[in-house]
A protein has these predicted regions:
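Disulfide-rich extracellular modules and peptides
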Residues: 20-21
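C-terminal motif of bacterial Sec signal peptides marking the signal peptidase cleavage site
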Residues: 14-17
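Sec-dependent signal peptide recognition
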Residues: 2-8
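Extracytoplasmic c-type cytochrome modules immediately beyond a signal peptide or single-pass transmembrane anchor
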Residues: 25-129
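The canonical Cys-X-X-Cys-His
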Residues: 76, 106, 131-146
């Protein structure tokens, strides 16, 4: 009888000690996942002053253009530069995670060689980025080396 009571008591303690709720799941931060579709990851960058991180995605033509260190994207190239605010990771000291989506910039070249630039963000009314400068910035990226 004593063994049965002891087993029940230990089981009760074990079950109740594991039911602690985690009240600060996300610390009030919203994290958005970007779906690149058929575009592949090319490179990334970090801006500590603005506390942002960016990832450059593109198709095969974009990868070829950046690998050749061209000044302009090849015909058919599509590139998207996705920028997020970053935050300290509450689960790992010294780590960062993506947070609020800041902007999605797109550069693409049509079959005639015309280069178009578009940006989606909340700040487009107050600040219009220089198209030529942004295209040069895109073309300054170097693809990460893959094993």
């Amino acid at each position: 009888m004593k063994n049965t009571i002891l087993i029940l008591l230990v089981s009760l303690v074990a079950l109740t000690s594991c039911s602690k709720e985690n009240n600060d799941k996300d610390n009030g931060l919203s994290r958005i996942v970007f779906d690149p579709g058929n575009l592949k990851f090319i490179s990334n960058s970090l801006n500590p002053k603005k506390e942002t991180m960016s990832a450059l995605y593109g198709n095969e033509k974009a990868l070829e253009s950046l690998s050749k260190e061209s000044q302009t994207p090849e015909v058919g190239a599509v590139m998207k530069l996705v920028t997020w605010k970053y935050h300290d990771n509450p689960q790992y000291i010294g780590g960062t995670i993506t947070g609020e989506l800041v902007s999605i910039e797109t550069v693409q070249t049509d079959q005639s060689g015309n280069i178009s630039y578009a940006v989606k963000d909340d700040l487009t009314e107050s600040s219009s980025p220089d198209k030529e400068e942004r295209i040069k910035y895109f073309m300054s990226y170097r693809p990460v080396s893959r094993p």
